[in-house]
Design a protein with these regions (language model features):
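Conserved ABC ATPase "signature" region
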Residues: 110-131
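Short helical segment in ABC ATPase nucleotide-binding domains corresponding to the A-loop/adjacent helical element
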Residues: 95-103, 116
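The feature captures the beta-strand-to-loop junction immediately N-terminal to the Walker
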Residues: 40-42
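Short beta-strand immediately N-terminal to the Walker A/P-loop
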Residues: 37-38, 81
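Conserved ABC transporter NBD signature motif
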Residues: 63-75, 111
Length: 140
């Protein structure tokens, strides 16, 4: 059986004033379809970095990620991340904040009208249609 997720020799480093800071060094993980895996570790050990690479929000410095035998190079509609410390851009409306992500994920596959409909549909799913034009400080 092929792996559902294959993280293959993933390295990640970030530039700093003192040179590259290596945060991941040759990470390997294979997950079969239906299998559940937890990443456990202390703060700062790279768990979120691995998940951001799998989500397509970051590109590994070396190595790669395959999801259902397709290389992950950008965010996609088949993956989602719930951030620990989320924030909305205070100068944008609820609709505009959500639309940023929708445009990023679907810009190549959906028309402008389809992205508008998708944004409104998903805000309706979480009962936020009434707040489309409100700024984050106007909702609770």
């Amino acid at each position: 059986m092929n792996e559902y997720l294959n993280i293959d020799h993933v390295h990640m480093s970030f530039p700093t004033d003192k040179g590259p800071l290596e945060v991941l060094n040759s990470i390997n993980l294979k997950v079969k379809k239906g299998e559940f895996v937890s990443l456990i570790g202390h703060s700062g050990c790279g768990k979120s970095t691995v998940l951001n690479i799998v989500a397509g929000l970051l590109n590994a410095t070396q190595g790669g990620v395959l999801l259902e035998d397709k290389e992950v190079t950008e965010p996609g509609p088949d993956r989602a991340v719930v951030f620990q410390n989320h924030s909305l851009l205070p100068w944008l409306t609820v609709y505009e904040n959500v639309r940023l992500a929708v445009d990023q994920v679907f810009k190549k596959t959906k028309s402008k009208q389809e992205r508008d409909e998708w944004t409104r549909h998903n805000l309706e799913l979480v009962h936020m249609s009434h707040a489309l034009d409100r700024k984050p400080d106007e909702i609770s």
